Design a protein with these regions (language model features):
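Bacterial Sec-dependent N-terminal signal peptides
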Residues: 1-25
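Surface-exposed, glycine- and small/polar-enriched segments that build interaction surfaces at terminal
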Residues: 24-338
């Protein structure tokens, strides 16, 4: 009798452990249960239970596989597949695939795929694929692939595709595609494609496409094209087009085209009014003659070429109006002596 009791006890423990282990294999719900004021058509025989039609004021249920329309909010503990529409917020604990439309926010714990539209923000934990449109911002913990349109900001680890924002596009790693920001575009690693903004483009590591800005472009290594009022790169192996172009590392064999070009590499190719390299000799010249009674100029002399900018006066008397001239010269030279 004693042996029978011990055997039954051990068997019950094994069965209980088996039951607990089976429960642990089920995916954990990311959200807590809450009030549900809606009409639902649900299949409870599956885990998690599938809701195929959901109509109500606000809903809180396991999984949507179909159509959900709510006046206030819609919350799924697991996944949402189909169309999810609410007046204020849509929340999916894990993944959403299909259409999400809300007045304030769409929030997905992991990945969102499809068409996502909100009055304020779209938030995804890992990635957003498809078309995301928000009045305020699109925010993704991973990447945005496809099209992201926001009134203020698009923020993600990577962006690949088309990103349009009224204020800024900010990425931790890579921007690839067409990136249009109202004021600035920032990529922590590299930009591949086109960065277009009215103020500033910044690439934390390299620019491998085209940076086009109204004020300035900044990159550690430029392998593409920079076009702005001011362009800066530590290493320039591409083309800089602007009023002022600067690169500060010796291994820069790209092209600088602008008014003022500054490079620490003696082999850099420069086309501009003032070209400065390590071997550039800066000379101040004072002269006079028939054309100018007196003139003062600065000459920037490189290995075979020079540029010169200065000012002078035709007449220095006091009985007539003073005339002032400005001039610029560029040319090539050959030294007659070593």
């Amino acid at each position: 009798m004693k042996r029978t009791f011990i055997s039954a006890f051990l068997l019950g423990g094994i069965l209980a452990g088996t039951h607990l282990s089976a429960q642990e294999t089920k995916p954990a719900s990311a959200l807590k249960k809450g009030p549900n004021v809606s009409l639902n058509i649900t299949n409870k025989k599956k885990f998690p239970p599938r809701t195929y039609v959901n109509l109500g004021l606000f809903s809180n249920y396991s999984c949507l596989n179909g159509l959900g329309i709510n006046a206030i909010s819609s919350l799924q503990h697991y996944n949402s597949y189909g169309m999810q529409i609410s007046g204020f917020t849509n929340v999916s604990g894990l993944k959403s695939t299909g259409v999400q439309i809300s007045g304030i926010a769409n929030v997905t714990g992991k990945r969102a795929c499809g068409f996502i539209l909100s009055g304020l923000t779209n938030v995804t934990g890992t990635s957003a694929y498809g078309l995301s449109i928000a009045g305020l911002g699109n925010i993704s913990g991973g990447d945005i692939k496809g099209v992201g349109i926001a009134g203020l900001v698009n923020v993600s680890e990577d962006t690949r595709g088309l990103a349009i924002s009224g204020l800024a596009n900010v990425n931790k790693d890579i921007q690839a595609g067409l990136i249009i920001g109202g004021l600035m575009n920032v990529s922590g690693n590299s930009s591949r494609g086109v960065q277009l903004t009215s103020l500033l483009n910044v690439s934390g590591k390299s620019n491998q496409g085209w940076q086009l800005a109204g004020l300035g472009n900044v990159s550690v290594e430029n392998k593409g094209v920079q076009t702005a009022l001011l362009n800066y790169s530590v290493t320039n192996r591409g083309v800089q087009l602007g009023v002022g172009n600067v690169n500060t590392k010796n291994s820069s064999k790209g092209y600088q085209i602008g008014i003022v070009n500054v490079s620490t590499d003696s082999t850099a190719h420069q086309i501009g009014c003032i070209n400065l390299k390590p071997q550039t000799r800066v000379q101040m010249l004072v002269s006079g003659g028939n054309a100018n009674k007196a003139s003062l100029s600065i000459r920037f002399k490189n290995k075979y070429t020079y540029t010169q900018i200065g000012t002078g006066a035709y007449y220095l008397g006091v009985d007539n109006k003073l005339s002032v001239t400005g001039f610029y010269r560029a040319g090539v030279y050959h030294s007659l002596t070593d």
